[in-house]
């Protein structure tokens, strides 16, 4: 099971706790939607900001979150590729 969480109201003037909760749900701006695993933690976070979000239960699993490479690793890979390109020329 998964939960579709959508930010339907502006969080202007919300307390810092609510802002942290909204960020924790992965919502960044008005109208954002996220498909999250249905866990007690996610339900509790959604309950805390229930006046700002809508919840919808969706069948199936939530997709695994995309992970970015840390900046140091990405920079190192670009440097190695650049050096390899320079050595060929």
From Swiss-Prot:
Gene Ontology CC terms, in alphabetical order: cytosolic large ribosomal subunit
Keywords: Ribonucleoprotein, Ribosomal protein
Gene Ontology molecular function: any one: structural constituent of ribosome
GO term, biological process aspect, one: translation
InterPro entries recorded: Ribo_uL30_ferredoxin-like_sf, Ribosomal_uL30_bac-type, Ribosomal_uL30_ferredoxin-like
Protein's UniProt keywords contain Ribonucleoprotein: yes
Keyword Ribonucleoprotein appears in the UniProt entry: yes
PANTHER family: LARGE RIBOSOMAL SUBUNIT PROTEIN UL30M (PTHR15892:SF2), MITOCHONDRIAL RIBOSOMAL PROTEIN L30 (PTHR15892)
Family to which this protein belongs: Belongs to the universal ribosomal protein uL30 family.
NCBIfam families registered for this protein in UniProt: rpmD_bact (TIGR01308)
Protein name (record): Large ribosomal subunit protein uL30
Organism: Myxococcus xanthus (strain DK1622)
């Amino acid at each position: 099971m998964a939960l579709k969480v959508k930010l339907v109201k502006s969080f202007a003037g919300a307390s810092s706790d609510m802002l942290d909760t909204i960020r924790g749900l992965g919502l960044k701006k008005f109208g954002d939607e996220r498909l999250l695993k249905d866990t007690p933690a996610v339900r509790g976070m959604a309950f805390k900001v229930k006046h700002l979000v809508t919840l919808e239960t969706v069948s199936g699993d939530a997709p695994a979150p995309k992970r970015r490479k840390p900046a140091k690793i990405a920079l190192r890979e670009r440097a190695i590729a650049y050096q390899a390109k320079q050595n060929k020329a």
